[in-house]
């Protein structure tokens, strides 16, 4: 996945036409579109290929099962046209290996959740986040998911993985995270959802956040 705008759109809507219209409006400001269960369950896997006409698609299924089931899920996701899948790390190395094995067959990527962005993400996941990051590094994942709502945690994860893995960081906007803060902490991409797709003008909202990110990268913050 190419790093240009450093922003990923989390497209958590449930209407096909709305999803495609938003993607058409904001594609120039995002490096990828992340879709999850809400949109896929409402419209079917076919929406992945439709959205892929605008930007690479990350399937946020937080895959978390035994290895064989993980293989089946990832195979379906990549066959549908996704460029990457998000998997949980707490299921262990063999389950993660299964996801990475299928991804490699398709020449696609796997992101591993180290810690989620909501307040409850600190309850049980934070104590094991660093171990998950080390496991993802050893397993050869493409990147990690770390919370934009807690930039210090992003910085900690970055110290563990160095420059060997990428970090995508959800929680910017509606959850309280600030794009420039998390980029400064070491994230490669910020993930933004409601602040864009619920805006009166998704295109303008995306443009403003993209400008904030680029200003941080230029050292203007």
Curated annotation (Swiss-Prot):
PROSITE patterns: OMPDECASE (PS00156)
GO molecular function per UniProt: orotidine-5'-phosphate decarboxylase activity
Protein residues bound to substrate: 12, 34, 60-69, 117, 170-180, 193-194
Record-listed E.C. numbers: 4.1.1.23
Top enzyme category: lyase
Biological process annotations from GO: 'de novo' pyrimidine nucleobase biosynthetic process; 'de novo' UMP biosynthetic process
Highest rank taxon of the organism: Archaea
Bilayer-crossing regions: none
A cellular component term, taken from the record's GO annotations: cytosol
The protein's annotated pathway: Pyrimidine metabolism; UMP biosynthesis via de novo pathway; UMP from orotate: step 2/2
Keyword annotations of the record: Decarboxylase, Lyase, Pyrimidine biosynthesis
InterPro entries, per database record: Aldolase_TIM (IPR013785), OMPdecase (IPR014732), OMPdecase_arc (IPR047595), OMPdecase_AS (IPR018089), OMPdeCOase_dom (IPR001754), RibuloseP-bd_barrel (IPR011060)
Subunit structure: Homodimer.
Role of this protein: Catalyzes the decarboxylation of orotidine 5'-monophosphate (OMP) to uridine 5'-monophosphate (UMP).
Family note: Belongs to the OMP decarboxylase family. Type 1 subfamily.
HAMAP family tied to this protein: OMPdecase_type1_A
Protein name per Swiss-Prot or TrEMBL: Orotidine 5'-phosphate decarboxylase
Organism lineage string: Archaea, Methanobacteriati, Methanobacteriota, Stenosarchaea group, Methanomicrobia
